[in-house]
């Protein structure tokens, strides 16, 4: 489900930009939500797509759902974003595995995954900054 954001069209050039756009909506949720930020060639946010809404601390993510809107929008790239309801943005082993799978799918589709940002309470983890992509 695509969501219209007031931030659409805003440049998203750093993990801090991602956090600024998504934290107000995600950091205090009681369940995990997984979003895809669809970017244009100038790294502007074209669309925010809510891929899944989980229960408590898990969220199932399938590449087909992640890339559906990106393909339709002719995305230049995407950024993966989800929250950890615990407030701790440390990536889990499942987070790492899903990210590897989605990066591989993005390569096949020629839609690069620029980052995966996990939102916690008042902080975040960027896979790109941490060297995990």
What are these model-derived regions, one by one?
Residues 1-50:
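Long amphipathic N-terminal alpha/beta scaffold segment
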Residues 15-20, 42, 52-133:
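Active-site-proximal loop/helix of nucleotide/amide-processing enzymes and allied scaffolds
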């Amino acid at each position: 489900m695509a969501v219209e954001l007031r931030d659409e069209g805003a440049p998203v050039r750093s993990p801090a930009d991602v956090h600024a756009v998504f934290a107000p909506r995600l950091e205090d949720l009681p369940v995990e939500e997984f979003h895809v930020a669809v970017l244009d060639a100038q790294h502007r946010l074209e669309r925010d797509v809510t891929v899944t809404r989980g229960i408590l601390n898990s969220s199932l993510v399938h590449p087909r759902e992640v890339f559906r809107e990106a393909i339709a929008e002719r995305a230049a790239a995407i950024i993966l974003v989800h929250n950890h309801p615990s407030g701790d943005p440390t990536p889990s082993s499942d987070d790492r595995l899903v990210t590897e799978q989605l990066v591989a799918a993005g390569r096949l589709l020629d839609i690069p995954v620029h980052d995966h940002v996990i939102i916690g309470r008042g902080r975040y983890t960027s896979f790109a900054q941490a060297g995990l992509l």
